[in-house]
């Protein structure tokens, strides 16, 4: 579950039905990690306090039901804080809520020939409210960061255009940076064939060759050297790009042995 997406579902209803006003919002920590936490400071009329408290409880039950068996530790809470000194202008607040609600998150397209493999996706990764100097004035800036990936460059550009439209309609400035080019795998590669044979000779079993949906340096190298054959391999990593990320130590030694064997084979 994306904590930012869940939070904005609650915010949209609180603003629409209970006259809530948004003061600030924070969520996510890394662009390549699905946000696990998000929070917002809102103001509400005194007579809406019980209604908003009930709203939060209802949404927590709803989210637990929607993600049953997937997000067992999901929590949604509300607590009183000091009254904020200022609120986000109402029109900006409304545009922001609509844009984040509309912004795609998750799988956008799968590989047609391999429908269990993701081709194109977007991660609505971070949102923050920051005070910055603009033309010698302190202003509050709301920043939203996404990470779009695809093994097909044109599909990535299509999805980026969708995201740009959503936030441009909300009056936001949209920029793109740090793009990873797509890397389309070549399962008929001679390099892959050689290293599969090497692995079998080294360990007496067949390697598991899979396509993964991730940003790899191979995409950047392949853009500059389109005829270069490449594969990516390494030790077993569990829960990547999360606070629970860890490596299987036993596979590091195996990985090292395979690197030596691969260099000899080449």
Question: For each predicted feature, which ranges?
Answer:
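Short glycine/threonine-rich loop-to-helix capping motif typified by GTGT followed
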Residues: 31-39, 87, 91, 184-197, ...
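Zn-dependent metallopeptidase/amidohydrolase metal-coordination segment
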Residues: 112, 119-138, 147, 198-263
């Amino acid at each position: 579950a994306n904590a930012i997406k869940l939070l904005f579902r609650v915010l949209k209803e609180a603003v629409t039905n209970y006259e809530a006003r948004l003061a600030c919002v924070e969520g996510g920590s890394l662009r390549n990690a699905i946000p696990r936490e998000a929070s917002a400071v809102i103001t509400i009329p005194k007579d809406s306090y019980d209604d908003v408290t009930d709203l939060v409880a209802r949404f927590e039950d709803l989210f637990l039901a929607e993600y049953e068996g997937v997000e067992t530790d999901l929590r949604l809470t509300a607590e009183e804080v000091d009254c904020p000194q200022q609120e986000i202008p109402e029109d900006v607040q409304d545009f922001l809520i609509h844009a984040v609600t509309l912004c795609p998150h998750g799988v956008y397209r799968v590989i047609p020939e391999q429908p269990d493999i993701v081709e194109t996706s977007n991660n609505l990764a971070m949102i923050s409210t920051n005070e910055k100097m603009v033309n010698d004035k302190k202003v509050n800036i709301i920043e939203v960061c996404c990470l779009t990936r695809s093994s097909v460059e044109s599909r990535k550009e299509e999805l980026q255009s969708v995201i740009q439209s959503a936030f441009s309609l909300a009056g936001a400035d949209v920029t793109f940076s740090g793009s990873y080019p797509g890397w389309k795998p070549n399962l008929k590669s001679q390099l892959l064939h050689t290293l599969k044979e090497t692995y079998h000779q080294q360990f007496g079993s067949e390697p598991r060759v899979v396509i993964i949906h991730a940003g790899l340096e191979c995409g950047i190298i392949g853009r500059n050297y389109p005829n270069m054959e490449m594969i990516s391999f390494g030790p077993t990593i569990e829960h990547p790009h999360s606070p629970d990320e860890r490596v299987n130590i036993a596979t590091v030694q195996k990985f090292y042995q395979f690197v030596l064997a691969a260099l000899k084979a080449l």
